[in-house]
Structures are given as C-alpha cells and as structure tokens.
From Swiss-Prot:
GO terms for molecular function: rRNA binding; structural constituent of ribosome. Gene3D superfamilies: 2.30.30.30. It comes from Natronomonas pharaonis (strain ATCC 35678 / DSM 2160 / CIP 103997 / JCM 8858 / NBRC 14720 / NCIMB 2260 / Gabara) (Halobacterium pharaonis). One of its GO terms (biological process) is translation. The lineage of its organism: Archaea, Methanobacteriati, Methanobacteriota, Stenosarchaea group, Halobacteria. Part of the 50S ribosomal subunit. It comes from the Archaea. GO terms for cellular component: large ribosomal subunit. Belongs to the universal ribosomal protein uL24 family. This is Large ribosomal subunit protein uL24. Keywords: Ribonucleoprotein, Ribosomal protein, RNA-binding, rRNA-binding.
Amino acid sequence: MTRQPHKQRNRQERAALHEKQKQVRAPLSPELREEYGQRNVRVNAGDTVEVQRGDFAGESGEVVTVDLRAAEIHVEDVTQETADGEEVPRPLEASNVQVTELDLEDEVREARLESEEDNE
C-alpha cells in the first residue's frame, strides 16, 4: 500500500465500479442512525437527503441519479443555470449530504439494513 498522495488519488479515480460504491456513502440523520444502528449508508436514487455543505446547504430533495464513475449524486431541485439559460442538475459529493429518508423498495437493501441493526 502506497502512502504517496498522487497514487492514492489515482487509485480512487481509477477504481472499479464495485469499489466506487464505497465513495457514495452519506451519513444518516440521527433518527435513522438510532433506528438502524449504523452511521452512514450508500446513497441510492429515491432516497431523500438534506444538503449540509456548499451553496445549497439546507435544501432537501430526492436523489435523482447516482453517478458511480464520478462518485457524484444529483438531487432534485439542486440545479444551476447554464450560460444559455438551461437548468442542469448540480453534482454533489455524497459526503456533503445527510440521508433523512431511505428508499426501501429494494428488499435486499432493507434486509441488509435490518441485519446490521440486529448485529448491534
């Protein structure tokens, strides 16, 4: 394992997609943290998040897309205007948001969260 910063950055940037999933994790709200017994969770499309940092701090919305290649998420109503006046989604780092509501339509995800809760 290298300690050189440029190699660390390259390794993160060039990671395989199944490893990049670790880069799109966000902290849970205190209520969800108490309920599920874990501190953070991978962000999925459909989750409701609150932006904690940056120009949009305090905004809440549903996650529209998760871009694993860029390790970014796009949140509903968090947009920026282009030079020609078009509204485009503003990419956010997952670490700068807090998950306030989980989308539990995926049975596997729900089972995983429940098993984590049981382990504590």
